[in-house]
A protein has these predicted regions:
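Conserved short loop/turn motifs at secondary-structure junctions
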Residues: 1, 81-82, 158-162, 244-253, ...
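Intrinsically disordered, low-complexity regulatory segments
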Residues: 1-139, 148, 210, 222, ...
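Core structural elements
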Residues: 138-149, 166, 196-198, 247-259, ...
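Metal- or metallocofactor-binding catalytic centers and their adjacent structured scaffolds
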Residues: 216-253
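Short acidic, hydrophobic short linear motifs in intrinsically disordered regions
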Residues: 239-242, 251-264, 291-300, 456-468
Length: 696
């Protein structure tokens, strides 16, 4: 009899099977097999919050197949993902297969390589019940909030709405930022910049006014700037101080889940959901030419910065051979994880550092290659030497005013030869200064006054929202992608370029939640709940008690809100159309229902006339001349079709434009991305160009 190994996905099963050989059957559970059914609450509150799990609809045959395979096996190993969710899947599998939870049949693979699989199979353990209970508590908590609160929100605002323990706080953070922006009052200020040329030199350098005789200067109006400009007319400028120094810049640590999502958003333009999908593929295994199915990275749901000694030895050897010993730090770098990190895992790193991105590029999709290269570069750079910069700072004085100039040159590239961390906001660019000496006289080539106004705080991007959620301790990095997908798909938040902007629906819902359920959308309260859930995971808090403590207050608050708001309905603004109701003559309006927008008569319920809502793009169909309209799939992905469908079958994922191709006369389509492009879809043409700023 062979041994049975159960994992979540077919891709993972294929990779593991390659390493285990013929003595094992490796099958996939396709994720969870049991869950709380969607049709009802499925939590018995009176019986200590007992969950009522059921086999997930459509998985009955899969469960039968797993039972059949288990009966024919000598040993059964549960090899689901090494995290809270994976532990719960193993626990549910043990239940349906009749396996004792204290049996040592749980194995973990931090990386799906020969050594990773061998190590995992050599160290089986029993199911971690504390981890399972933490997952159950989180699941039941989310179910109580969602299933109790969503109907109330839907009744008061609009059908089909949802509320959630994490998603509602995420929306609040975005709404609060929008309120900050609206309330912001810009303040005027001025700067004065100069360009100087040292005596006997042709190279100029820039400096900014920093202080006067009374200290650091603040210029608040044009009159003050004019006076300073007048004071400096025909003044002699002298170098008062020159300070030369050395600055070391150390590499960033390897990725954890949250930083991978942030950096992939900034550098690659990937949404978090896309990042996690591709990372899962790289972890579970990709067919590499000459190697077969190979797991390329370690487990991607982690908040630990720990790196194994073996990985450090391998990457050190690679750096030494490829760059030379001078690119190695004096000793290997070890990074400290956050205090609440699950340190059982490693950071996200290549499972085999010797597999460079270019060596596997031919076997990867474009997205897989980009993300693997990002992970590989970041990890390798984290074990490289510091970048060393030679810095110069100079003070230039004239008539009691001091200008400051700074610059640097790279003396040794170190890790920056491979990887430079990006930021949401570009760092100030600094250039190298010419040779300067104290008491040197310099000529002022240009003196420029600049008017500025203080700027409101920036709207959140996906990257900065993830950073904020992590800093506030809301949710867990593994859930951020799903949270952002939820709040955008439910139209509480919309995307404008990279910015996340609250919709009217998001603001109305958040204001209702703040008024009636302040704890649910309170950042500190949500963070405390996360800390309590972590205590359950560590076995220091009982999960039933956690739920009981939460639910008592929540239930009272909900009952009071229902009583206080009985008969109250909050109304969203309705956009008027130019369509006149053909039944009663009123001007029809755009409404939003459970399944999206529609056009209705405002005379409801006396007049129940409704018509389909069509979003026109202003572009004519290239096939029949009809209107190109925006359509959405079941998952709300946008595509473009013809208003004359089904008579005309024009359809495109890319947005058509009114611009004609200069080569063949066909219409150009817009392809979105980090750098949007316009391209001609006419077969054999191939014309493409970068989209104008207005097109982006």
């Amino acid at each position: 009899m062979s041994d049975l190994v159960i994992v979540e996905s077919p891709a993972k099963a294929k990779t593991i099977k390659k390493y285990l050989g013929s003595g094992y059957e490796v099958v996939a559970s396709m994720g969870h097999v049991r869950d709380l059914p969607k049709s009802r609450l499925s939590v018995d509150i009176k019986k200590n919050f007992a969950p009522k799990y059921e086999i997930i609809k459509g998985k009955e045959k899969l469960v039968d197949d797993l039972k059949s395979a288990a009966e024919k096996s000598e040993h059964i190993y549960l090899a689901t993902d090494p995290d809270r969710e994976g532990e719960a899947i193993s626990w549910h599998l043990a239940y349906i297969l009749g396996l004792p939870t204290d049996e040592t049949n749980r194995v973990e693979f931090n990386e799906i390589t020969k050594s990773g699989v061998t190590n995992g199979m050599s160290n089986p353990r029993s199911i971690n019940i504390d981890l399972v209970n933490a997952q159950q508590a989180r699941r039941i908590l989310d179910r109580l909030v969602g299933y109790k609160l969503s109907p109330f929100i839907s009744q008061k605002i609009r059908r089909g709405l949802s509320a959630g323990r994490v998603q509602s706080v995420a929306v609040r953070i975005i709404v609060d930022r929008e309120e900050e922006i609206r309330k912001f009052k810009p303040e005027e200020y001025w700067s004065i910049d100069a360009k100087f040329i040292p005596k006997g030199s042709r190279k100029s350098f820039s400096a900014s006014l920093y202080s006067d005789e009374n200290g650091k200067i603040k210029i608040t109006n044009g009159e003050q700037a004019d006076k300073i400009e007048a004071d400096l007319q025909n003044a002699e400028y002298v170098i008062a101080k020159v300070k030369n120094g050395t600055r070391k810049k150390s590499p960033a640590p390897p990725f954890i889940t949250s930083t991978l999502q942030q950096e992939a958003s900034r550098k690659l333009g990937f949404q978090s959901r896309r990042t996690m999908k591709v990372a899962q593929e790289l972890y579970e295994g990709v067919d590499i030419e000459g190697m077969g199915a190979t797991g390329l990275i370690t487990y991607m749901r982690t908040d630990s910065l720990r790196i194994s000694n073996v990985a450090i030895e391998e990457v050190t050897e690679y750096i030494k051979n490829s760059y030379g010993e001078k690119f190695l730090p004096p000793k290997p770098r070890f990074f400290k994880s956050r205090s609440n990190a699950q340190d059982g895992h490693e950071a996200i790193r290549p499972s085999m550092p010797s597999l460079t991105p270019d060596s596997v590029k031919a076997s990867l999709t474009s997205d897989q290659y980009k993300l693997y290269k990002l992970i590989w570069n970041r990890f390798t750079a984290s074990q490289m030497a510091d970048c060393i910069q030679k810095t110069t700072q100079a003070d230039i004085v004239a008539n009691g005013y001091t200008f400051k100039a700074s610059g640097y040159r790279v003396d040794f590239e170190g890790f920056t030869t491979l990887y430079v961390e990006s930021k949401d906001v570009e760092e100030e660019k600094t250039t190298q200064l010419p040779p300067l000496e104290k008491d040197m006289i310099v000529r002022c080539k240009e003196l420029k006054k600049n008017q500025h106004f203080t700027q409101p705080p920036a709207r959140y991007t996906e990257a900065s929202l993830i950073k904020a959620l992590e800093e506030y301790g809301i949710g867990r990095p593994s859930t951020y992608a799903a949270t952002i997908t939820t709040i955008t798909s439910h139209e509480y938040v919309k995307r404008e370029g990279k910015s996340l902007v609250p919709t009217e629906l998001g603001e109305v819902t958040t204001n209702l939640m703040k008024e009636r359920f302040p704890k649910i959308v309170n950042v500190k309260f949500t963070n405390q709940m996360e800390e309590d859930l972590d205590k359950v995971e560590k076995g220091t808090e009982e999960w039933h008690a956690l739920l009981d403590n939460f639910y008592g207050d929540f239930d009272k608050t909900l009952k009071k809100a229902k009583a206080d708001m009985e008969g109250v309905k909050l109304h969203l603004k309705e956009d008027e159309t130019d369509i006149i109701c053909d039944k009663c003559g009123r001007q029809m309006v755009v409404k939003v229902g459970r399944y999206g927008k529609f056009i209705a008569c405002p005379g409801y319920p006396e007049c129940k006339n409704i018509i389909k809502y069509v979003e026109k793009t202003g572009v004519k169909c290239p096939k029949c001349g009809g209107d190109v309209i925006i359509k959405r799939t079941k998952t709300k992905r946008i595509f473009y079709g013809c208003s004359n469908y089904p008579k005309c079958d024009f359809v495109s994922w890319n947005e058509p434009t009114n611009e004609k191709c200069p080569q063949c006369g066909g219409i150009l389509f817009k392809k979105k991305g980090k750098k949007p492009t316009l391209f001609c879809a006419t077969e054999g043409c191939g014309y493409t160009k970068t989209a104008d700023t207005d097109d982006k």
